[in-house]
Design a protein with these regions (language model features):
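Catalytic cores and adjacent flexible loops of soluble metabolic enzymes
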Residues: 1-222
Protein backbone atom coordinates (compact mmCIF):
# COMPACT_ATOMS: atom_id res chain seq x y z
CA UNK A 1 0.00 0.00 0.00
CA UNK A 2 3.02 2.31 0.37
CA UNK A 3 4.46 1.71 -3.09
CA UNK A 4 3.44 5.27 -4.07
CA UNK A 5 4.68 6.82 -0.81
CA UNK A 6 7.92 8.40 -2.03
CA UNK A 7 8.84 10.17 1.26
CA UNK A 8 8.41 6.96 3.24
CA UNK A 9 10.36 4.85 0.74
CA UNK A 10 13.21 7.37 0.68
CA UNK A 11 13.19 7.43 4.50
CA UNK A 12 13.59 3.63 4.54
CA UNK A 13 16.50 3.94 2.13
CA UNK A 14 18.37 6.00 4.72
CA UNK A 15 18.94 2.80 6.72
CA UNK A 16 20.98 1.41 3.80
CA UNK A 17 19.32 -1.97 4.18
CA UNK A 18 17.80 -4.06 1.37
CA UNK A 19 14.12 -3.27 0.88
CA UNK A 20 11.45 -5.92 0.26
CA UNK A 21 8.77 -4.17 -1.79
CA UNK A 22 5.34 -5.74 -2.09
CA UNK A 23 3.58 -4.91 -5.37
CA UNK A 24 -0.01 -5.44 -4.21
CA UNK A 25 -2.67 -3.22 -5.86
CA UNK A 26 -0.06 -1.60 -8.12
CA UNK A 27 0.58 -1.47 -11.85
CA UNK A 28 3.90 -1.81 -13.67
CA UNK A 29 4.41 1.95 -13.95
CA UNK A 30 4.05 2.33 -10.19
CA UNK A 31 6.47 -0.55 -9.60
CA UNK A 32 9.02 0.92 -12.03
CA UNK A 33 8.76 4.31 -10.34
CA UNK A 34 9.21 2.93 -6.82
CA UNK A 35 12.17 0.84 -7.95
CA UNK A 36 13.78 3.93 -9.49
CA UNK A 37 13.37 5.85 -6.21
CA UNK A 38 15.17 3.08 -4.37
CA UNK A 39 17.83 2.67 -7.06
CA UNK A 40 18.59 6.39 -6.88
CA UNK A 41 19.49 5.86 -3.22
CA UNK A 42 21.79 2.95 -4.03
CA UNK A 43 19.74 0.41 -2.07
CA UNK A 44 18.98 -3.11 -3.31
CA UNK A 45 15.38 -4.23 -3.76
CA UNK A 46 13.44 -7.48 -3.68
CA UNK A 47 9.99 -7.44 -5.30
CA UNK A 48 7.07 -9.54 -4.12
CA UNK A 49 4.18 -10.31 -6.43
CA UNK A 50 1.07 -9.69 -4.37
CA UNK A 51 -2.69 -9.34 -4.77
CA UNK A 52 -3.96 -6.98 -2.09
CA UNK A 53 -7.33 -8.65 -1.61
CA UNK A 54 -8.27 -10.55 1.59
CA UNK A 55 -8.73 -13.37 0.84
CA UNK A 56 -7.46 -13.57 -2.73
CA UNK A 57 -9.64 -15.87 -4.88
CA UNK A 58 -7.69 -18.40 -6.93
CA UNK A 59 -8.72 -16.79 -10.21
CA UNK A 60 -7.08 -13.52 -9.14
CA UNK A 61 -3.81 -14.95 -7.78
CA UNK A 62 -2.10 -14.54 -11.19
CA UNK A 63 1.00 -16.45 -10.12
CA UNK A 64 2.51 -16.21 -13.60
CA UNK A 65 3.30 -12.61 -12.70
CA UNK A 66 6.19 -14.04 -10.67
CA UNK A 67 7.79 -15.01 -13.96
CA UNK A 68 6.78 -11.67 -15.43
CA UNK A 69 8.62 -9.83 -12.67
CA UNK A 70 11.66 -12.07 -13.10
CA UNK A 71 11.80 -11.13 -16.80
CA UNK A 72 11.20 -7.43 -16.19
CA UNK A 73 13.68 -7.22 -13.30
CA UNK A 74 16.22 -9.98 -14.03
CA UNK A 75 18.74 -8.67 -11.49
CA UNK A 76 16.29 -8.54 -8.56
CA UNK A 77 15.19 -11.11 -6.05
CA UNK A 78 11.56 -11.91 -6.83
CA UNK A 79 9.13 -13.39 -4.33
CA UNK A 80 5.46 -13.78 -3.52
CA UNK A 81 3.20 -12.41 -0.79
CA UNK A 82 0.18 -14.70 -0.49
CA UNK A 83 -3.34 -13.87 0.65
CA UNK A 84 -5.20 -16.92 -0.69
CA UNK A 85 -6.94 -19.21 1.76
CA UNK A 86 -4.41 -21.80 2.98
CA UNK A 87 -6.20 -25.00 1.98
CA UNK A 88 -3.37 -27.28 0.89
CA UNK A 89 -0.93 -24.36 0.48
CA UNK A 90 -0.99 -24.81 -3.30
CA UNK A 91 -0.47 -21.11 -3.99
CA UNK A 92 2.82 -20.96 -2.08
CA UNK A 93 3.97 -24.29 -3.50
CA UNK A 94 3.26 -23.10 -7.05
CA UNK A 95 4.98 -19.78 -6.39
CA UNK A 96 8.07 -21.65 -5.24
CA UNK A 97 8.01 -23.82 -8.36
CA UNK A 98 7.75 -20.65 -10.48
CA UNK A 99 10.96 -19.34 -8.95
CA UNK A 100 9.83 -17.19 -6.02
CA UNK A 101 12.85 -16.77 -3.75
CA UNK A 102 10.96 -15.10 -0.90
CA UNK A 103 7.62 -16.44 0.34
CA UNK A 104 5.48 -14.37 2.72
CA UNK A 105 2.15 -15.29 4.27
CA UNK A 106 0.29 -14.26 7.39
CA UNK A 107 0.73 -16.66 10.31
CA UNK A 108 -1.62 -17.24 13.21
CA UNK A 109 -2.00 -19.63 16.12
CA UNK A 110 -5.80 -19.43 15.84
CA UNK A 111 -7.67 -18.84 12.57
CA UNK A 112 -10.90 -18.16 14.46
CA UNK A 113 -9.59 -14.98 16.08
CA UNK A 114 -11.37 -11.76 15.05
CA UNK A 115 -9.87 -9.34 12.57
CA UNK A 116 -8.95 -9.26 8.91
CA UNK A 117 -5.73 -11.27 9.14
CA UNK A 118 -6.31 -14.54 10.99
CA UNK A 119 -8.91 -16.32 8.85
CA UNK A 120 -6.75 -16.42 5.71
CA UNK A 121 -3.45 -16.97 7.54
CA UNK A 122 -1.59 -20.24 7.82
CA UNK A 123 -1.18 -21.97 11.16
CA UNK A 124 1.51 -24.33 12.43
CA UNK A 125 -0.10 -27.36 10.76
CA UNK A 126 -0.22 -25.57 7.41
CA UNK A 127 3.41 -24.56 7.83
CA UNK A 128 4.57 -28.09 8.69
CA UNK A 129 2.67 -29.55 5.73
CA UNK A 130 4.10 -26.88 3.44
CA UNK A 131 7.64 -27.61 4.60
CA UNK A 132 7.19 -31.34 3.98
CA UNK A 133 5.77 -30.69 0.52
CA UNK A 134 8.64 -28.41 -0.47
CA UNK A 135 11.19 -30.96 0.73
CA UNK A 136 9.50 -33.59 -1.47
CA UNK A 137 9.30 -31.21 -4.43
CA UNK A 138 13.02 -30.54 -4.10
CA UNK A 139 13.61 -34.28 -4.36
CA UNK A 140 11.19 -34.64 -7.28
CA UNK A 141 12.75 -31.78 -9.25
CA UNK A 142 16.21 -33.35 -9.25
CA UNK A 143 18.65 -31.78 -11.69
CA UNK A 144 18.85 -30.74 -15.35
CA UNK A 145 21.15 -33.60 -16.35
CA UNK A 146 19.60 -36.53 -18.24
CA UNK A 147 21.29 -39.87 -17.75
CA UNK A 148 20.28 -43.48 -17.31
CA UNK A 149 19.93 -44.19 -13.61
CA UNK A 150 20.90 -47.39 -11.85
CA UNK A 151 17.22 -47.84 -10.98
CA UNK A 152 16.45 -47.96 -14.72
CA UNK A 153 18.92 -50.78 -15.49
CA UNK A 154 16.26 -53.53 -15.35
CA UNK A 155 14.07 -51.53 -17.73
CA UNK A 156 16.96 -51.02 -20.13
CA UNK A 157 17.66 -54.74 -20.10
CA UNK A 158 14.12 -56.07 -20.26
CA UNK A 159 11.92 -53.34 -21.77
CA UNK A 160 14.21 -52.44 -24.68
CA UNK A 161 14.03 -54.43 -27.93
CA UNK A 162 16.52 -56.66 -29.74
CA UNK A 163 16.64 -57.61 -33.40
CA UNK A 164 15.17 -61.06 -34.14
CA UNK A 165 14.54 -62.99 -37.32
CA UNK A 166 11.10 -62.27 -38.73
CA UNK A 167 11.34 -65.49 -40.76
CA UNK A 168 13.76 -68.33 -41.36
CA UNK A 169 17.00 -67.04 -42.90
CA UNK A 170 19.11 -69.60 -44.74
CA UNK A 171 22.89 -69.63 -44.57
CA UNK A 172 24.41 -67.46 -47.28
CA UNK A 173 21.40 -65.16 -47.61
CA UNK A 174 21.94 -61.40 -47.62
CA UNK A 175 20.09 -59.72 -44.79
CA UNK A 176 17.27 -57.33 -45.76
CA UNK A 177 14.90 -55.27 -43.62
CA UNK A 178 12.02 -57.62 -44.41
CA UNK A 179 13.87 -60.45 -42.65
CA UNK A 180 14.06 -58.57 -39.35
CA UNK A 181 11.79 -57.47 -36.56
CA UNK A 182 12.40 -56.44 -32.94
CA UNK A 183 11.16 -57.85 -29.67
CA UNK A 184 11.89 -57.77 -25.96
CA UNK A 185 14.18 -58.24 -24.06
CA UNK A 186 17.08 -56.00 -25.02
CA UNK A 187 19.83 -58.56 -24.53
CA UNK A 188 20.80 -58.84 -28.20
CA UNK A 189 21.57 -56.43 -31.03
CA UNK A 190 19.78 -53.11 -30.55
CA UNK A 191 17.47 -51.90 -33.35
CA UNK A 192 19.62 -48.75 -33.23
CA UNK A 193 22.33 -50.83 -34.94
CA UNK A 194 20.12 -52.26 -37.70
CA UNK A 195 22.11 -50.48 -40.42
CA UNK A 196 25.17 -52.53 -39.46
CA UNK A 197 23.18 -55.76 -39.83
CA UNK A 198 21.54 -54.97 -43.17
CA UNK A 199 23.57 -56.27 -46.07
CA UNK A 200 25.41 -58.82 -43.95
CA UNK A 201 25.50 -62.51 -44.91
CA UNK A 202 24.02 -65.21 -42.68
CA UNK A 203 26.79 -67.59 -41.63
CA UNK A 204 24.37 -70.36 -40.60
CA UNK A 205 20.65 -70.95 -40.81
CA UNK A 206 18.73 -68.59 -38.52
CA UNK A 207 15.34 -69.74 -37.28
CA UNK A 208 12.26 -67.56 -37.22
CA UNK A 209 11.97 -65.59 -33.95
CA UNK A 210 15.62 -66.31 -33.08
CA UNK A 211 17.51 -63.57 -31.25
CA UNK A 212 20.25 -62.21 -33.48
CA UNK A 213 23.89 -61.96 -32.38
CA UNK A 214 26.87 -60.53 -34.21
CA UNK A 215 28.50 -63.91 -34.79
CA UNK A 216 25.59 -64.91 -37.04
CA UNK A 217 26.77 -62.59 -39.83
CA UNK A 218 29.67 -62.03 -42.15
CA UNK A 219 30.31 -58.91 -44.20
CA UNK A 220 29.07 -58.99 -47.77
CA UNK A 221 31.85 -58.97 -50.35
CA UNK A 222 29.73 -57.15 -52.93
Amino acid sequence: SDITNKPFIEYLCEFSKPIILSTGASDLNEIDRAVSWIDNKGVSTALLHCILSYPTPDEHANLRMIQGLKKRYPDRVIGYSDHTLPGDMSALETAWLLGAQILEKHFTFDKSLPGNDHYHAMDKVDLMNFRCTIRRLETLLGEEEKRALDSETPARQHARRSLVAARTISAGMKITAEMLTWKRPGHGISPAEIDQVLGGIAVDDIHEDELLTWDMFAESRE
